[in-house]
From Swiss-Prot:
Protein name, UniProt field: 3,4-dihydroxy-2-butanone 4-phosphate synthase
Molecular function GO terms recorded: 3,4-dihydroxy-2-butanone-4-phosphate synthase activity; magnesium ion binding; manganese ion binding
Gene field: ribB
Family, similarity comment: Belongs to the DHBP synthase family.
EC supergroup of this enzyme: lyase
Function field: Catalyzes the conversion of D-ribulose 5-phosphate to formate and 3,4-dihydroxy-2-butanone 4-phosphate.
GO cellular component: cytosol
Species, as recorded: Edwardsiella ictaluri (strain 93-146)
Binding site for Mg(2+) 2: E38, H153
GO terms of biological process kind: riboflavin biosynthetic process
Site label Essential for catalytic activity, positions: H136, E174
Keyword Magnesium set for record: yes
This protein's pathway: Cofactor biosynthesis; riboflavin biosynthesis; 2-hydroxy-3-oxobutyl phosphate from D-ribulose 5-phosphate: step 1/1
Obligatory cofactor(s): Mg(2+); Mn(2+)
UniProt keyword annotations, A-Z: Lyase, Magnesium, Manganese, Metal-binding, Riboflavin biosynthesis
Length: 219
């Protein structure tokens, strides 16, 4: 069903390329997972390009759980413990402890404050003391191998921003409807059209990587 709805956004390969182009232009992307998985759409942005206005949009239309997707190397650089030692969540979502910038924020809740926290966490020279714990930004550790290892929004975010040429760090938040329910594919696509965002699925990204990477290794 989703593939029929998605045809307006191009072929699977076109959808990935349009998503990468949007990220390079500083725009957001809507990422859908499988209908048989969470069946949710997440707004994602390249962390280093995200604006206050985009963070405000994310907070206004999202679940309120603004996540910063990072690699294991970045988690270690920041000395962020995992939220739990025994992860029993259904999809193994890898939350670390929450964070707040140590400098330049007030309560940490505003769009500006959350973006300040994101920027503190992704700085090249970021160190553990640059962040307070807990806070209002939720880091997520991506699994090595990206969507080829785990078909989650976290891994899709890292793959997309990396393929777009940015450092491997991205912001995501689940899109919700006005009544507080989770947005499904039709609502995600309507939101994407309204805000001029491309739509891509995790399945698209898996196919894109599988098609490209053997060729790159052969070259």
């Amino acid at each position: 069903m989703n593939q029929i709805l998605l045809s307006d956004f191009g072929t699977p390969m076109e959808r990935v390329e349009r998503a990468l182009s949007a990220l390079r232009d500083g725009r957001g992307v809507m990422v859908l997972d499988d209908e048989n998985r969470e069946n949710e759409g997440d707004m994602i942005f390249a962390a280093e390009k995200m604006t206050v206005e985009q963070m405000a949009l994310t907070i206004r239309h999202g679940s309120g759980i603004v996540c910063l997707c990072i690699t294991e190397a970045r988690r270690q650089q920041l000395d962020l413990p995992m939220m739990v030692s025994n992860n029993t969540s259904h999809y193994g979502t890898a939350f670390t402890v929450t964070i707040e910038a140590a400098e330049g924020v007030t309560t940490g809740v505003s769009a500006q404050d959350r973006l300040t926290t994101v920027r503190a966490a992704i700085a090249d020279d970021a160190k553990p003391g640059d962040l307070h714990r807990p806070g209002h930004v939720f880091p997520l550790r991506a699994r090595p191998g990206g969507v080829l290892a785990r078909r989650g929004h976290t891994e899709a975010t890292i793959d997309l921003v990396s393929l777009a040429g940015f450092r491997p760090a991205g912001v995501l938040c689940e899109l919700t409807n006005d009544d507080g329910t989770m947005a499904r594919a039709p609502q995600v696509m309507a939101f994407a059209r309204q805000h001029e965002m491309p739509v891509v699925t995790i399945e698209d990204l898996v196919a894109y990587r599988q098609a490209r990477e053997p060729q790159e290794q052969a070259d």
